[in-house]
């Protein structure tokens, strides 16, 4: 190769390497749309009903939300309060995708979209799909009912009796912290240190 040919080859190799690295990690960013059907097949009927409403934005406000919580008695529940304009929410969604696929046969997951237009909320869910529905909460009625009245994200944990046992206000700094809280508050397990 000539000197110019070598420079071109090195330049193209560098561009290919950099371009390949741009999509290497999906942790904390909208990654490929996962297929949850296999992981969640055989879920108990109340949880299967949630999975059939995967990634949908539901109306009905606090009354519909409370009715859903009541219908899930017998299962621990994790509720993530999010908004399309929230950067930390976008960071947490891939972790919620993984956790809901991993534990979705034993734990109910729900979302609450706070103060969004329907179009923005649906666009967000289109880029970061989850195997559970989210309730639209434009007036913050649901947020007030669970005490999530500040910023977003917030994550609420209910026990099997439908009682709110913990509300994490604000974002999780690391995916491992969110996983540990799901294991602690939803499953009653302590995270083992590695």
Predicted region positions:
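A short beta-strand-turn-helix
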Residues: 53-77
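Sec-exported extracytoplasmic/periplasmic mature domains
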Residues: 70-74, 91, 98-105, 126-133, ...
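Thiol/disulfide oxidoreductase modules built on the thioredoxin-like
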Residues: 124-131, 138-193
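Structural microenvironment flanking redox-active thiols in thiol-disulfide oxidoreductases
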Residues: 90-128, 138-145
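N-terminal targeting signals for export/organelle localization
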Residues: 1-59, 191-194
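Active-site-proximal beta-strand/loop segments in catalytic clefts of secreted hydrolases
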Residues: 81-83, 112-115, 137-138, 168-170
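Short pre-active-site segment immediately N-terminal to redox-active cysteine/selenocysteine motifs
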Residues: 75-77, 82-85, 151
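Hydrophobic beta-strand anchors of alpha/beta hydrolase catalytic cores
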Residues: 78-79, 109, 155
């Amino acid at each position: 190769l000539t000197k110019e040919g070598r420079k071109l080859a090195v330049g193209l190799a560098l561009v290919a390497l950099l371009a390949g690295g741009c999509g290497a990690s999906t942790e904390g960013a909208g990654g490929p749309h996962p297929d949850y059907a296999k992981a969640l097949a055989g879920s108990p009927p109340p949880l299967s009903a949630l999975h059939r409403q995967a990634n949908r934005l539901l109306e009905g406000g606090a009354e519909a939300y409370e009715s859903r919580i009541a219908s899930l008695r017998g299962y621990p529940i994790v509720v993530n309060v999010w908004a399309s304009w929230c950067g930390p929410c976008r960071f947490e969604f891939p972790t919620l995708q993984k956790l809901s696929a991993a534990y979705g046969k034993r734990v109910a997951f729900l979302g609450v979209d706070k103060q969004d237009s329907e179009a923005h909320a649906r666009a967000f869910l289109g880029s970061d799909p989850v195997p559970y529905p989210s309730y639209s909460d434009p007036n913050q009625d649901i947020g007030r009912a669970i005490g999530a009245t500040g910023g977003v994200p917030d994550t609420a944990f209910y026990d099997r009796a439908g009682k709110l046992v913990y509300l994490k206000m604000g974002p999780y700094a690391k995916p491992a912290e969110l996983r540990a809280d799901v294991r602690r508050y939803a499953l009653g397990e302590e995270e083992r240190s590695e």
